[in-house]
Design a protein with these regions (language model features):
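Residue-level signal for inorganic ion chemistry
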Residues: 1, 26-29, 48, 52, ...
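AMP-binding/adenylate-forming
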Residues: 1-39, 47, 71
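Anion (oxyanion) recognition and catalysis
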Residues: 2, 64, 97
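Gly/Ser/Thr-rich phosphate-binding loop
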Residues: 25-28, 36-92, 102-104
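Generic beta-strand structural signal
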Residues: 44, 105-106, 138, 145
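Glycine-rich beta-strand-to-loop/alpha-helix junction loops that act as flexible
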Residues: 50-53, 74, 113-115, 163-165
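Conserved ATP/PPi-binding loop(s) of AMP-dependent carboxylate-activating enzymes
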Residues: 96-99, 106-135, 155, 165-167
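AMP-binding/adenylate-forming catalytic core of the ANL superfamily
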Residues: 114, 135, 140-206
Length: 206
């Protein structure tokens, strides 16, 4: 966008609708776009890139009715965000890799490679490698590639997303069972129209 002559707007700690005043393009999670449309606020947005959760067709159609084109994307923080993108069309796939990104499926898992990606994970004073010896990053996402387009099928672990935030059930369970009156806890995702999924804890108490 910047190379194309656009201006980047950075605003801090304001309501979403206020932050986006005057903006024509934005990257949002579906929950944020739902809230914008439900507020009936005047929108200057022309196009929105959506990601971080399942994207309902109802949402993209409603946005289109208000003059906002929507694009669905798949990305990771390790890759400076977007890896695949396409204009939302109701199909299940998230599009083809953007220029400079490579993608393949290994034993049902999505593997990625690109020049613009993180050098590694910084832990305990050390930079841990992100990729294997051939430069491929194993995402832990399940997927399939049909006609060059990626369709995501879920996770290989228990991670799920709520409002664009990744939630690892085991981490939440560990905090819950730290309470002296909780014997055990099990956290599961529950489908939610606004957040995509919400975490729900089933607990056994003393």
């Amino acid at each position: 966008w910047l190379l194309a002559g656009a201006r980047l707007t950075v605003r801090d700690k304001q309501p979403l609708a206020q932050m986006l005043q005057g903006c024509t393009h934005a990257s949002l999670v579906p929950t944020q776009l739902w809230r914008l449309l439900n507020d009936d606020a005047a929108l200057s947005l022309k196009a929105v890139l959506l990601g971080g959760a399942a994207i309902p067709v109802e949402l993209t159609e409603r946005a289109r009715g208000q003059g906002v084109r929507t694009y669905c994307g798949y990305g990771l923080t390790e890759f400076a965000s977007t890896v695949c993108a396409k204009e939302a069309d109701g199909a299940a796939d998230v599009g083809a890799p953007l220029p400079g990104r490579e993608m393949k499926i290994v034993a049902g898992e999505v593997w990625l490679r690109a020049a613009s990606m993180a050098a590694g994970y910084w832990r305990d004073g050390q930079l841990l490698p992100l990729t294997n010896d051939e430069g491929w990053f194993a995402t832990r996402d399940r997927g399939e590639i049909i006609n060059g387009r990626l369709t995501l099928l879920g996770r290989l672990d228990n991670l799920f997303f709520s409002g664009g935030e990744g939630i690892q059930p085991e981490e939440v369970e560990r905090i819950i069972v730290a309470h002296p009156q909780i014997q055990q806890a099990f956290v599961v995702p529950l489908d939610d129209a606004e957040y995509g999924q919400r975490p729900v804890a089933v607990v056994e108490c003393d």
